[in-house]
From Swiss-Prot:
Organism annotation: Rhizobium meliloti (strain 1021)
Name of the molecule in the record: 3-dehydrocarnitine:acetyl-CoA trimethylamine transferase
Ranges annotated as spanning the membrane: none
Gene name of this polypeptide: bcoG
GO molecular function, one term: metal ion binding
Family to which this protein belongs: Belongs to the BKACE family.
Requisite cofactors: Zn(2+)
Keywords annotated in UniProt: Metal-binding, Transferase, Zinc
Enzyme Commission number, as recorded: 2.3.1.317
Catalysis: reaction(s): 3-dehydrocarnitine + acetyl-CoA = N,N,N-trimethylglycyl-CoA + acetoacetate
Entries under InterPro entries matching the protein: Aldolase_TIM, BKACE
Pathway: Amine and polyamine metabolism; carnitine metabolism
Function: Catalyzes the condensation of dehydrocarnitine and acetyl-CoA, forming acetoacetate and betainyl-CoA (N,N,N-trimethylglycyl-CoA). Is involved in a L-carnitine degradation pathway that allows R.meliloti to grow on L-carnitine as the sole source of carbon and nitrogen.
Subunit text: Homotetramer.
């Protein structure tokens, strides 16, 4: 994809994620009500898309419960503001080995493995306009945790998402994930317009330096739509990088807790900062209806 600034940008807000962030900021939403309210505030601040995980309301731990997804979905859809709903389908591929000398039995506390149909059950239940598809397996963070997404698993999940009329958002953590996404497209398992999220700076995928970022961008076909984000200290620099490279923007408490040095943020504040950055570059922020037209989404 040639370097060409995007002049019409949509912002995705990743509302809560599944990371161990609840104890680090009181702004991280936990209950379905909190998640939905935070998503709605992000939409009011300028996010056209909200990307939602769910958490156990009692512990804050990541969850896959259908009732939690249904409540979040219903609350967002009944709100007085329009927004494109994007649900994760990344859960159910978590494998934590025992230790380096005895990998089996696996760590039951951290391991959460499910089949393709179970991993997209909440997608079939809630029918969001978009859901994520983590397009590869990789060592994740520290210790012995592997995020597993085998080729056969990804093919079946993509097939089910497409059959449901839900647009997969390919989460690419490295260039090989883009390679496999192209294979899914060639096999007709994902359809045009293809949507990609470039996930930068997440150990141990692609680092978020600009050379690596542009290597990722250059592997995105020119007729595909992409967004990009980084986590941590470079998170609020990435809106500018993504737009300059021709892409769209993702911010949110899933990826970053701070709007400035030492300043814990809400999702709405992160979106407001992204809007300011994008508009200061001379680009236009587009809303949910324009995103639906661009991505050929089915509003629910």
């Amino acid at each position: 994809m040639p370097l060409s600034m995007n002049r019409e940008v949509f912002i995705t807000c990743a509302v809560t994620g599944a990371g161990d962030t609840v104890s680090k900021s009181s702004h991280v939403p936990v209950t379905p009500k909190q998640i939905a309210e935070s998503a709605i505030e992000a939409a009011k601040a300028g996010a056209a898309v909200v990307h939602c995980h769910v958490r156990d309301p009692e512990t804050g731990a990541p969850a896959r419960r259908l009732d939690l997804y249904r409540e979040v979905t219903d609350r967002i859809r009944s709100a007085d503001i329009d927004v494109v709903l994007n649900l994760t389908a990344g859960m159910g591929g978590d494998l934590v080995f025992g230790n380096v000398e005895s990998p089996f039995p696996v760590d039951e506390k951290g391991t959460d493995m499910a089949g393709a149909t179970e991993r997209v059950a909440h997608v079939a239940e809630c029918l969001p306009e978009i859901c994520t598809l983590d397009c590869g397996t990789m060592n994740f963070s520290l210790g012995d945790y592997v995020m597993t997404n085998t080729p056969s698993m990804l093919r079946e999940m993509a097939r089910q998402m497409t059959a449901l009329g839900v647009r997969p958002e390919i989460e690419a953590f490295d260039t090989g994930h883009l390679w496999f996404a192209k294979q899914l497209a060639e096999e007709g398992l994902i359809e045009d317009p293809v949507l990609i999220q470039l996930c930068m700076g997440i150990p141990w995928g692609a680092p978020d330096d600009l050379n690596t970022f542009m290597a990722m961008v250059n592997n995105v076909p020119s007729n595909w739509t992409f967004s990009a984000f980084s986590i941590g200290r470079n998170a609020m620099a990435y809106p500018a990088a993504a737009v300059l490279a021709g892409g769209n923007v993702r911010v949110g408490l899933e990826d970053n807790l701070y709007v400035g040095k030492g300043q814990l943020a809400t999702n709405a504040q992160l979106v407001e900062k992204a809007v300011s950055v994008v508009e200061s570059m001379g680009a236009k922020i587009i809303g949910p209806e324009e995103v639906r037209r661009k991505l050929k989404l089915t509003k629910r």
